Swiss-Prot record:
<dbReference type="GO" id="GO:0042802">
    <property type="term" value="F:identical protein binding"/>
</dbReference>
<comment type="function">
    <text>Catalyzes the transamination of N(2)-succinylornithine and alpha-ketoglutarate into N(2)-succinylglutamate semialdehyde and glutamate. Can also act as an acetylornithine aminotransferase.</text>
</comment>
<dbReference type="GO" id="GO:0019544">
    <property type="term" value="P:arginine catabolic process to glutamate"/>
</dbReference>
<dbReference type="GO" id="GO:0006593">
    <property type="term" value="P:ornithine catabolic process"/>
</dbReference>
<comment type="similarity">
    <text>Belongs to the class-III pyridoxal-phosphate-dependent aminotransferase family. AstC subfamily.</text>
</comment>
<dbReference type="InterPro" id="IPR004636">
    <property type="entry name" value="AcOrn/SuccOrn_fam"/>
</dbReference>
<dbReference type="InterPro" id="IPR015424">
    <property type="entry name" value="PyrdxlP-dep_Trfase"/>
</dbReference>
<dbReference type="GO" id="GO:0030170">
    <property type="term" value="F:pyridoxal phosphate binding"/>
</dbReference>
<dbReference type="InterPro" id="IPR015422">
    <property type="entry name" value="PyrdxlP-dep_Trfase_small"/>
</dbReference>
<dbReference type="Pfam" id="PF00202">
    <property type="entry name" value="Aminotran_3"/>
</dbReference>
<keyword id="KW-0032">Aminotransferase</keyword>
<dbReference type="InterPro" id="IPR049704">
    <property type="entry name" value="Aminotrans_3_PPA_site"/>
</dbReference>
<protein>
    <recommendedName>
        <fullName>Succinylornithine transaminase</fullName>
        <ecNumber>2.6.1.81</ecNumber>
    </recommendedName>
</protein>
<dbReference type="InterPro" id="IPR015421">
    <property type="entry name" value="PyrdxlP-dep_Trfase_major"/>
</dbReference>
<feature type="modified residue" description="N6-(pyridoxal phosphate)lysine">
    <location>
        <position position="252"/>
    </location>
</feature>
<keyword id="KW-0663">Pyridoxal phosphate</keyword>
<keyword id="KW-0808">Transferase</keyword>
Length: 406
C-alpha cells in the first residue's frame, strides 16, 4: 500500500519556490474541484488562466485518449499530423503565416525575443539589439524573459542579467518613445498586464507602439500568453485593438490544461529562423497538439466568444454589488474573463488574505500583486457556478472585513 500524501509532504520534498494552498485538489469537473477531504470549491482561478474549458472536459479527454493510444513522442526529427493540423488552425484564425511550438509561455517568449534579435542582426547588423519592455510586466522565468519582465523582485537575485533591455512605463507612449530608437530590435508588451494587476492597454498606447516600431524598423511582440485563446472575448486580444503585431506568443489556455506554447509570426520574420537556429525536444508533440487542436475548435466559435462577453457582465455586476456592500475595491477592471478587483487604500497589500478567506469559503481566486484580486475562470463557466462562487466570495469578503474591524 502506498504512503498517504499530505500537504506537509510538499514542504519536506519540494524545492520551496512555491507556497501552495493548505489543501490538495484531487478531482475536478467543469468549474468545480474537490480536495482530499471531499470539500468542494468553485474554481475562478482556472489554473492561472489555463483551464479555459474547465476540468476534465469530455471532448479534451477524448482527444487526449485517442492520441495516447497511437503514439506520444518522436522528437523534432519527425513531424506529426496533430501538430500540422494545429498549425493550420492557428494560421487560419490569426494574422500569422508560420508557427513554432514549444511547451510554455516562457519558452514562447524566449523564442520571440531570439527571433527578434536574429531578424535585426541579419537585416541591419549586430548594433540593433535593444529590447524595450514595460515595468510590472511578466514574460516568464527564463533568464531572458524574467529580465524583460520589468519586476526586479523576480530578477534581482540572478545578475548579471542579459544586457540591452530597457523598461518604459506601461500605457505611457511618451515613456516608450523616449526608449525606442534605431538600435531597438523589438518591443514586447502584454495587451493586458496580468501579473502586473490586470491593467488593459489603451488603444492609443498599442497603436502608438505599432507606429514607433514601424518608424524604427523594430518588431512588435504581443505576449498573449494570458490574454489569448478566447480569454478576452476575442480569440486573441490584439483583435480588440485593431493593432497587428509582428510576433504573438500564446500558451496557457491553448492546451486547456495540457502544457503547450506557440510563437506565431509572419513569413518575413520566420524566414530568418533556419534549421538549427532554435528548437525544443517536446514542442509540438502529438499529445499536446491533439488537445490544443480540440481546444481551438471548441473556443473559436461565435457562441463561445460571445458567451465570454456575457459572463464578463455577470461577474462585473455581482462584484460591484459585493463592493457596494463591503467597500473593498476602488475599481473592477479587465476584459472578458480576465478581471481584477483593485483594493482601496484601507486594504492595500491584503489581496492574499482575501484569496485565503475565499478558499476557506469554497471558492478559488487569484491575486495579481498585493493589491488586486484576480478572476480567470473557465470560459464556459455556468451562470449557476458564477452565482454560487460569488456568493461564497461575498461571504469571504464579509468575514475578511469583520475580522479586520473586530
Amino acid at each position: 500500500m502506498s504512503q498517504p500524501i499530505t500537504r506537509e509532504n510538499f514542504d519536506e520534498w519540494m524545492i520551496p519556490v512555491y507556497a501552495p494552498a493548505p489543501f490538495i485538489p484531487v478531482r475536478g469537473e467543469g468549474s468545480r474541484l474537490w480536495d482530499q477531504q471531499g470539500k468542494e470549491y468553485i474554481d475562478f482561478a482556472g489554473g492561472i488562466a489555463v483551464n479555459a474549458l474547465g476540468h476534465a472536459h469530455p471532448e479534451l479527454r477524448e482527444a487526449l485518449n485517442e492520441q495516447a493510444s497511437k503514439f506520444w513522442h518522436t522528437g523534432n526529427g519527425y513531424t506529426n499530423e496533430p501538430v500540422l493540423r494545429l498549425a493550420k488552425k492557428l494560421i487560419d484564425a490569426t494574422f500569422a503565416d508560420r508557427v513554432f511550438f514549444c511547451n510554455s509561455g516562457a519558452e514562447a517568449n524566449e523564442a520571440a525575443l531570439k527571433l527578434a534579435r536574429k531578424f535585426a542582426h541579419d537585416r541591419y547588423g549586430s548594433h540593433k539589439s535593444g529590447i524595450v519592455a514595460f515595468k510590472n510586466a511578466f514574460h516568464g522565468r527564463t533568464l531572458f524573459t524574467v529580465s524583460a519582465g520589468g519586476q526586479p523582485a523576480y530578477s534581482q537575485d540572478f545578475a548579471p542579467l542579459p544586457p540591452d533591455i530597457r523598461h518604459a512605463a506601461y500605457n505611457d507612449i511618451n515613456s516608450a518613445s523616449a526608449l525606442i530608437d534605431d538600435a531597438t530590435c523589438a518591443v514586447i508588451v502584454e495587451p493586458i498586464q496580468g501579473e502586473g494587476g490586470v491593467v488593459p492597454a489603451s488603444n492609443a498606447f498599442l497603436q502608438g507602439l505599432r507606429e514607433l516600431c514601424d518608424r524604427h524598423n523594430a518588431l512588435l511582440i504581443f505576449d498573449e500568453v494570458q490574454t489569448g485563446v478566447g480569454r478576452t472575448g476575442e480569440l486573441y486580444a490584439y483583435m480588440h485593438y485593431g493593432v497587428t503585431p509582428d510576433l504573438l506568443t500564446t500558451a496557457k489556455a491553448l492546451g486547456g490544461g495540457f502544457p503547450v506554447g506557440a510563437l506565431l509570426t509572419t513569413e518575413e520574420c520566420a524566414s530568418v529562423m533556419t534549421v538549427g537556429t532554435h528548437g525544443t525536444t517536446y514542442g509540438g508533440n502529438p499529445l499536446a497538439s491533439a488537445v490544443a487542436g480540440k481546444v481551438l475548435e471548441l473556443i473559436n466559435t461565435p457562441e463561445m466568444l460571445n458567451g465570454v462577453k456575457q459572463r464578463h457582465d455577470w461577474f462585473v455586476e455581482r462584484l460591484n454589488t459585493i463592493n457596494h456592500r463591503y467597500g473593498l475595491f476602488s475599481e473592477v477592471r479587465g476584459l472578458g474573463l480576465l478581471i481584477g478587483c483593485v483594493l482601496n487604500a484601507d486594504y492595500a497589500g491584503q489581496a492574499k488574505q482575501i484569496s485565503q478567506e475565499a478558499a476557506k469559503a469554497g471558492v478559488m481566486v487569484l491575486i495579481a500583486g498585493g493589491n488586486v484580486v484576480r478572476f480567470a475562470p473557465a470560459l464556459n463557466v455556468s451562470e449557476e457556478e458564477v452565482t454560487t462562487g460569488l456568493d461564497r466570495f461575498a461571504a469571504a469578503c464579509e468575514h475578511f472585513v469583520s475580522r479586520g474591524s473586530s
